[in-house]
């Protein structure tokens, strides 16, 4: 992290407050990861209903991501950060007030606005602030808020749920995100980049289907399906196997692995290219799901968690930096919104689809099916990530530059 010593005081302060806000955001959000499915089951929901409620989170992301990206480009990143953090602070209080499926779906969808706004504005602001030649390194370090939060949050949530019940759990989640709001207030919004008058006016769907965005979005779609099924059902799968493992430890192990990978992959990608690390992350995702599919003891579950953390800790930052490389400053919010649309769709439909599979096939066979998704994602990236198959292979293996990068 020596790169930060070379930055001026105002830039360091901005990055520090942004990092603190991100840490509170992901801790509050992640405190519900291992516990909310159990809460929904506690009030009498079926496996499919659990999947539908959990998947509703991504519906909020899906509906709001395009508008949040555009708002970040037009009005600045800070206002979108505030919108996202406010949604994250309010939603946990809503869970306390309802005990039926439909209202829970509505609140869960509202909760999804938090990531649509905060995550989009966060990565856009970091990209604005990072020096171009150290972009991968700075984005990698600043993205550590995710594994740190996802490591701290489930431990807090699991402890509170087991020792004090659901009310303190939801109140603590709201309190953490309220602290995040206080961290955003002193952040100085950088000047808004203006669009040149002679530039092409691409709409959201034109951006999404363009060569520079389409393949990363498809890879994120398949990864979102995998991650959505895992995060929705891993707690229930562990419980169904009878293995003596706190589900919160699964998420903590994944977070430790994710943290470790982000320490060096960002800086390494500045030297070896983004494509190589995207490929490595998809390989790790495949091995992760295989471990979980075959797990019958704590070691295999934790090994799967370690591989999943390495995969997600590499894939999301690498795609984020890849999209930054391919975007001009005045369109970064929309580019991030479009590329992450695939991830949102995957998360949105994973719960209902794989909840149905879990009802008929059981949790173990359901995870077996998800293995194919990561293999397909890897094949697509290896063959379609650049102009043609040979060029794509070279890019995906770190042998050539990204032809879509903005020079």
Predicted features and spans:
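Juxtamembrane intracellular "pre-TM" segments in multi-pass secondary transporters
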Residues: 2-12, 189-216, 398-407
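Residue-level signature of mid-helix packing/kink "hotspots" within the transmembrane helices
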Residues: 58-66, 150-151, 255-259, 263, ...
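Conserved MFS/SLC helix-loop-helix module at the cytosolic interface between two early adjacent transmembrane helices
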Residues: 63-96, 271-272
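Helix-breaking motifs and short loop linkers at transmembrane-helix boundaries and internal kinks
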Residues: 76, 97-102, 273, 294-296
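Structural signature of the two symmetry-related core transmembrane helices
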Residues: 79-93, 174, 276-290
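Paired small-residue
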Residues: 102-110, 299-307
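Cytoplasmic helix-loop-helix junction between adjacent transmembrane helices
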Residues: 109-145, 321
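C-terminal membrane-cytosol helix-exit motif in multi-pass small-molecule transporters
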Residues: 175-193, 380-385
